């Protein structure tokens, strides 16, 4: 298991982000018409990004193509192909961008707009950039990978993970914590 924590300078962060992610200008999103299950919207999508639903036993049930404006629902699996990129914006203003060959599951998202209280927990494989919204100002967002848990409060983090390693770059914010998962055998 390999865990790597990076703290980037402002200039190297700008260079890294500009190389990896598409700059989104003028993306307007309306959150007023969300049902109880809808927690966000796809703000930008490049090539094939899918929303996959698995039942409680893990059996695949449904796959939908994600396009700009697509409503994000909790517990769905958002996946990109080898050329895919997508940016999602949650109703508290949290934005996350996933790179090629990546997968994110929004396990838990609770948000009270009156108090800005709530929490966010997700699973991620591949490349993810998270910009915390109102929920992460008070409570850390949790990003679970196969080998570590990354907590980020009030900031921006880039996480790159696969089955053997997780790298987390703390770009900006209040705090980031990376906790390696222990082997169950010892």
For the regions a language model picked out, list residue spans one by one.
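Bacterial N-terminal signal peptides that target proteins for export
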Residues: 3-21
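Flexible, surface-exposed loop/linker segments and immediately adjacent secondary-structure boundaries
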Residues: 33-186
